[in-house]
């Protein structure tokens, strides 16, 4: 049955207007981006087909636009619409960190942003947020990329980037493609090495977030960061 023949309260657009976007299923939300169906199936059925064959939702939407365009029912126009929607969501979350407020005072916003950037990635990515002396965001960079199990991390490069940005503080993050956000012993070891290396140039490590499924794990919240050491000189 075409969507326009459905009861009005069950049509995705009307349901969203009446009850809000959280009332819609993944397939119904995706159908609103598609606009119409494919191969004799309506937009919701097409969305369900895509999710069943290529999902779940994050796996489907993590694909590059050129790869999405090759999937049945999408094509260049719809894949670009989906990619644009994701980029808007990314910029919306980034805006929480980019309006001159102290990032270090808003760990929830940092966690949401990093979760959006890193969760569901097929390989490990190591990122750094560089902050000024009032803990406002200067830059956010992906520094290292690895395999499904690990990304090589070089403290010297992190320090170099911090100095380049004249950063006073840094927040680190990486993802676990396995989905388990619990820090490993290697995570703890490299965090300690990075904290010591940054301290040598008077840059403070505020936190290290590990992103997987669910809520990111914060080293600072867990008490896993070493206390700042007093400077010997100066």
From Swiss-Prot:
Coiled coil: none annotated. A motif (JAMM motif) lies at residues 174-187. Keywords: Hydrolase, Metal-binding, Metalloprotease, Protease, Zinc. Zn(2+) binds at residues 174, 176, 187. One of its GO terms (molecular function) is metallopeptidase activity. The keyword Metal-binding applies. Residues 103-225 form the MPN domain. GO terms for biological process: proteolysis. It comes from the Bacteria. The keyword Protease applies. Belongs to the UPF0758 family. This is UPF0758 protein Smal_0281.
